[in-house]
């Protein structure tokens, strides 16, 4: 069975084609700068070198058409025709409480999803454009929606209800949803596989640390709490997002700086976090280099980031009633020895001890805790695309 996985962003489309017989990636790449000058498609067949094609891409549909053309190209392609694609899996950011698991697209699902686009206005509309393009270009091929939020639908009420007037929850469905669910789901299953224990027996804290970052408490294989909230703005300090702050601060700043709701939203989402504190960059590598050169604000930014993660680890250790495994994943989690060290330093009383030598690992699966560490600490590169492909196979198999 061959599965195409699509992840449509505001100006990009990431794609991968899997042969699910052995979960091998046949081709992958990225269409970027959609609707802008300098648009292009990066294409890689198997493990061959990447090729870059400069192509005008005015719309997401055009980008997907060009991706399909490359997939069946007689020189570069991997398919004799698009009919070889058995199903398409779409990454969708927000399913609200309407979708508690991955679903096959039909008229009812399509219309329900269309009704919750405003839950993630920067993401869901573009996810839908990907679905629309595939329905038009590949009629009859099953389309599956895989939601970032669905893994967290197992949270208990006390974890997801905000202390606001309850009628706001009833009227607007304002509650914690959480994100990066596909990543947290994948690494929790993968680490259980690597240590040879059923995931249902483990207490896991999963740290997805990238430009966007979240942390999840996983008990008996299920998410019981997560740091992101109604939107991806809540929780950890991120590349450009503030994470947890006193809710009165935006109101105060709107008055003092004469800012509109849109302007304050822009500041909290795109000008805060590591970038806001350091004044250097939203890229942790740049901030790390600046800190090494003595930039005090860059150093402070990394300390604030690590401190917040550490607080969440402590909180989740408490609600889990102990901890078996701590997992680091995503860009910083996988490739940030400094950040991992800052986070784990001082957590020895919780049974977390890093091996300094093993902690130098970047981008590989490895247990980085010491032999006498009560908690196993792992680096697990995330693979959301593979998880989406697996979910697609599972859902289509139910049909």
UniProtKB/Swiss-Prot annotation:
Positions that bind Mg(2+): 7, 384
Assembly and binders: Homodimer.
Any one Gene Ontology cellular component term annotated for this protein: cytoplasm
NCBIfam families reported for this sequence: ackA
Top EC class, one word: transferase
Protein name in the entry: Acetate kinase
Single Gene Ontology MF annotation: magnesium ion binding
Recorded metabolic or biological pathway in which this protein acts: Metabolic intermediate biosynthesis; acetyl-CoA biosynthesis; acetyl-CoA from acetate: step 1/2
Keywords, ordered alphabetically: ATP-binding, Cytoplasm, Kinase, Magnesium, Metal-binding, Nucleotide-binding, Transferase
Function: Catalyzes the formation of acetyl phosphate from acetate and ATP. Can also catalyze the reverse reaction.
Superkingdom in the source lineage: Bacteria
Site (Transition state stabilizer): 180, 241
HAMAP family: Acetate_kinase
Gene for this chain: ackA
Enzyme Commission numbers on file: 2.7.2.1
A biological-process GO annotation: acetyl-CoA biosynthetic process
Enzymatic reactions: acetate + ATP = acetyl phosphate + ADP
Family to which the UniProt record says this protein belongs: Belongs to the acetokinase family.
Co-factor binding details: Mg(2+). Can also accept Mn(2+).
Subcellular location: Cytoplasm
KW Cell wall biogenesis/degradation (keyword) present: no
Residues annotated as catalytic: 148 (proton donor/acceptor)
Organism of provenance: Dictyoglomus thermophilum (strain ATCC 35947 / DSM 3960 / H-6-12)
Keyword Metal-binding assigned: yes
Binding, substrate: 91
Cofactor (UniProt): Mg(2+); Mn(2+)
